[in-house]
Amino acid sequence: MTQRIIIIGGGPAGYEAALVAAQHGADVTIVDSDGIGGNCVLYDCVPSKTFIATTGVRTDMRRAEEMGVQAHFDPTAYRLGQVNGRVKSLARAQSADIRAQLQREGVRLLSGRARVHNSQPGMATHSVEVTFENGQKKVLDADVVLVATGSSPRELPDARPDGERILTWRQLYDLTELPKHLVVVGSGVTGAEFVSAFTEMGVKVTMVSSRDRVLPHEDADAA
């Protein structure tokens, strides 16, 4: 009997599980509201690495003179809008590649928000209610429901993101001009990446952290 599997969330955990399940003959459906690939592909891991690769060009140019190559780089030459446009374009391309791979494996993709549906209050069932973008709802039955909703940026009560002066790591790629001074709250991997990248671009950067060192979850020597 074919197993019916519904996966809530289309990030790395969700789409990898979907691919494996489909390859083993399961009937798989992914319900996702933010885009296949999730935060990792669309807003975090892939975009940040692309962004860092851009700043790495300046790093190479600074070292060029040591190798006998005359090179001059004007920090104002950065076209941040163009840089971020490339970042977003590559992220969308990878998301599209993952979507195509899922569809080739026969995975059904639904765009909407999902929640576990209980036809009788207090009685857990293997049903999921999907609310589509147009407001319509549909209840799907499953043998297995996998919740893989991932993470979202933490918002501080007294510093709500407004997309202009206070930004989450999702909104940072909407900037079109380099800031004169960037304050990064958090010393984890994402925070450290942005500190490194914007410093290399000539921006004054201040890191604020509640921990006693950068990269608190990594090896102490590396941090």
PLM feature spans:
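Glycine-rich flavin
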Residues: 2, 19-26, 31-178, 211-215, ...
